[in-house]
Amino acid sequence: MSIWVDADACPVVIKDMLYRAARRTNTTLTLVANSFLRVPPSPLIRAIQVPAGFDAADDLIAERVAAGDLVITADIPLAAAVLAKNAQALDPRGNWYTPGTIEERLRMRSMLDQLRGSGVDTGGPSAFSQRDSKSFAGELDRWLSRQRPQPDASAPQSADEPPTE
């Protein structure tokens, strides 16, 4: 299992969390962006710079993501492509994209695009907050803990481990 990041619009605080989590859990982390990214030196962390172009980073992630991987993105069409490949998608604010919600999110995005195209000011998302950061951290930690192999209940217990039931 790997974590992929649509990194062009990903907040720095989220990237920093992901770097620490990758090292702590020995998880491969790949950041994809149209611009150069400086990432910490680690065999687990890599950055891929794609040529400038509409959806180039999204297309690469959608092509390479595998079932069971996690993708961090605020891009709804990318999240839909990720879910179609049986991977999971989480936005930088800690909200999961799910098969049950993705169609509604795509419809809402399309409607807002149409309104903006006709000159209506639809505003934008609220500023990224500390609450968003905490929500993301909690969801990431829960996902990472579900990925760890569970101890085998039939395996012999060491003397300093409590018995499992």
Swiss-Prot record:
Region annotated Disordered, chain positions: 115-134, 139-165
What superkingdom heads the lineage?
Answer: Bacteria
InterPro entries under this entry? UPF0178
Q: Which NCBIfam families match?
A: PRK00124.1
* Matching HAMAP family: UPF0178 (MF_00489)
Family named by the database record: Belongs to the UPF0178 family.
Which named protein is this?
A: UPF0178 protein Bphyt_5655
> What is the organism of origin for this protein?
Paraburkholderia phytofirmans (strain DSM 17436 / LMG 22146 / PsJN)
Cite the source lineage.
Bacteria, Pseudomonadati, Pseudomonadota, Betaproteobacteria, Burkholderiales
